[in-house]
Design a protein with these regions (language model features):
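N-terminal glycine-/serine-/threonine-rich beta1-alpha1-beta2 phosphate-ribose binding loop
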Residues: 1-84, 195-197
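C-terminal substrate-binding/catalytic lobe of Rossmann-fold NAD(P)-dependent oxidoreductases
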Residues: 5, 24-30, 36-55, 153-258
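Gly/Ser/Thr-rich loops at beta-strand to alpha-helix junctions
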Residues: 12-14, 74, 97-100, 121-130, ...
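A generic structural signal for well-ordered alpha-helical segments
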Residues: 83-84, 107-111, 162
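General beta-strand structural signal in soluble alpha/beta enzymes
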Residues: 92-93, 118-122, 148, 172
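Rossmann-fold NAD(P)-binding glycine/threonine-rich loop
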Residues: 94-118
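Short alpha-helices
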Residues: 112, 116-137
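Oxidoreductase and adenylate-handling cofactor-binding alpha/beta cores
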Residues: 128-144, 159-171
Length: 258
């Protein structure tokens, strides 16, 4: 049996991470990276793999078994998910929880019409944490499940920040509220709102002359990302961002109490 031939769509942080993971799996090989940028400007780490423009992927339809979609959930995946699923088997980590049913319907329709298989929303959460919840709930059938993310960088929320007009760069940290974690670990099975479980901390580099008040308002009121949380927005320089916020740690807990 030959190796699974992989295509990567999007070459940001996720795409680069997927490339490194493919190298560690002997039954896979990277055939091509697809980008909306000028392919000549994208330097990948895999010898023999090609860099192609997004619009040229159809030409490799018979050379790729699975496309891994590495775009953001805010604006990328809702567009490219169904588009790519019409021609290829796909997998992605779409994580805007409230919009998963809509995204599922759109990708499902395209995949069925193209006679392909698409697996959606199997990243961090939903994904690995979903399996943790399922495993815990199958053991403690009666009880309450709690998920805490962080402290760490949410790549999806960071991507959403960077797409706001006037934002040059930015990063977002998800911070679990310790008092809430302690309540859950006590076994008291508290009823906690979204706002009571996490804080969101945003560090933003604004474009020169940008309206910072408008940027802050756009972040704090963004549906499905920040509007249900207590969110702080701190404006910093590009140099501060590179010096103090260039790493991408993350973590979290799934706790089942019953």
């Amino acid at each position: 049996m030959g190796k699974i031939r992989i295509g990567i769509v999007g070459y940001g942080n996720i795409g680069r991470g997927v490339e490194q993971s493919i190298k560690r799996n002997d039954d896979m090989e990277l055939k091509a990276v697809f980008t909306r940028r000028d392919p000549a400007s994208v330097k990948i780490q895999t010898e023999g793999a090609e860099v192609k423009h997004f619009d040229d992927m159809e030409a490799m339809k018979d050379e790729i078994d699975v496309m891994i979609l590495c775009g953001g959930s805010a604006t990328d995946l809702p567009v490219i998910g169904p588009k790519v699923a019409a021609s290829f088997n796909t997998i992605d980590s779409f994580d805007t929880h409230a919009k998963i049913p809509e995204y599922f319907a759109n990708v499902d329709k395209a995949a069925k019409e193209g006679k392909n298989v698409s697996i959606i929303s199997v990243g961090w959460d939903p994904g690995m944490f979903s399996l943790n919840r399922l495993y815990a709930e199958s053991i403690l059938v009666q009880g309450s499940t709690y998920t805490f993310w962080g402290k760490g960088v949410s790549q999806g929320h960071s991507d959403a920040i960077r797409r706001i007009e006037g934002v040059k760069n930015g990063i977002q940290y998800t911070v679990p509220i310790e008092a809430a974690v302690d309540q859950v670990r006590s076994g008291s099975e508290p009823e906690l709102t979204t706002r009571q479980k996490h804080l969101r901390e945003c560090y933003v580099v604004a474009e020169e002359g940008a309206d910072k008040a408008a940027i802050e308002e756009a972040i704090k009121t963004m549906p499905n990302y920040f509007d249900e949380y207590d969110t702080t927005v701190t404006f910093i320089t590009e140099e501060e961002l590179k010096k103090n916020h260039s790493k991408m740690p993350h973590g979290g807990f799934v706790i089942r109490s019953g």
